[in-house]
């Protein structure tokens, strides 16, 4: 099944983009574990740094995430210093899989992959990646026919009399497009995964897929279902699932 498929290894014929930074207290839980929303912010930071260093921030400035995969093999904990490596693992003419590996001075290892879509800044629709950026993507992968395939069930299950959990939005949850920021979704995930210490205690995978944006003023509810091996959350607005997240052991 797609959810279980392994992430690609780092390239051997090219050097990934690399950066490092201290693990900050604003990104950790009370037990000093690096939270999922903190991971998301580091992924956003290295994406911006990579775009600036490579120059495609000028030619292809607007990208959105369709999916994020986070594999926590060994969690990071404060205090520590994180080392991030970013490379391109597959692409097509309008989107790309971006891999980021997080390691640390104290032995943390977190592997991630994001499915990024290039948008036209005027229309907000998917658009062709510039030739110069396509050339850059090809430096770390030969896979140039990437297609979208969902890993998670997008439709939320029936309520079945079980209460949803309201998750009020804040103005600080919104990005420049007026959409709920990727990291803010993972604030909601953090609210619920702490109820599954059995999953957090083992190496685990979190996948979140974004179906449609959530905007200011909308009433967001989380619908959660658990089994022995996983926890799944649907982000529901007016009865419609806008995103799905699932966490399970690796």
Could you tell me what each predicted segment is?
Residues 2-7, 12-14, 69-153, 210-217, ...:
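HotDog/MaoC-like acyl-thioester-processing domains
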Residues 2-66, 113-115, 119-204:
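Hot-dog-fold acyl-thioester-processing enzymes
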Residues 165-249:
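Acidic/His-leaning functional-site neighborhoods
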């Amino acid at each position: 099944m797609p959810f279980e498929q392994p992430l690609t290894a780092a390239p051997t014929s090219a050097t990934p983009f690399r950066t490092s930074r201290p693990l900050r207290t604003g990104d950790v839980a009370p037990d000093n574990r690096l939270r999922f929303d903190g991971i998301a912010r580091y992924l956003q930071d290295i994406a911006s740094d990579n775009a600036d260093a490579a120059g495609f921030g000028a030619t292809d400035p607007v990208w959105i995430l369709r999916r994020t995969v986070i594999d926590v093999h060994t969690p990071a904990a404060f205090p520590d210093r994180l080392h991030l490596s970013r490379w391109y693992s597959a692409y097509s003419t309008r989107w790309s899989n971006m891999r980021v590996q997080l390691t640390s001075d104290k032995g943390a290892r977190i592997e991630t992959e994001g499915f990024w879509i290039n948008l036209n800044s005027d229309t907000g629709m998917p658009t062709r990646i510039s030739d110069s950026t396509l050339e850059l993507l090809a430096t770390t992968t030969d896979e140039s026919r990437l297609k979208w395939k969902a890993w998670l069930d997008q439709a939320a299950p029936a309520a079945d009399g079980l209460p949803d959990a309201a998750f009020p939005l804040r103005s600080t949850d919104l990005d420049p497009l007026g959409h709920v920021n990727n990291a803010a979704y993972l604030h909601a995930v953090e609210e619920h995964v702490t109820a599954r210490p059995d999953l957090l205690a083992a190496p685990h995978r979190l996948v979140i897929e974004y179906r449609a944006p959530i905007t200011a003023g909308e009433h967001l509810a989380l619908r959660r279902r658990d089994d022995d091996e996983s926890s799944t959350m649907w982000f529901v607005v007016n009865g419609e699932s806008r995103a799905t997240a699932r966490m399970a052991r690796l």
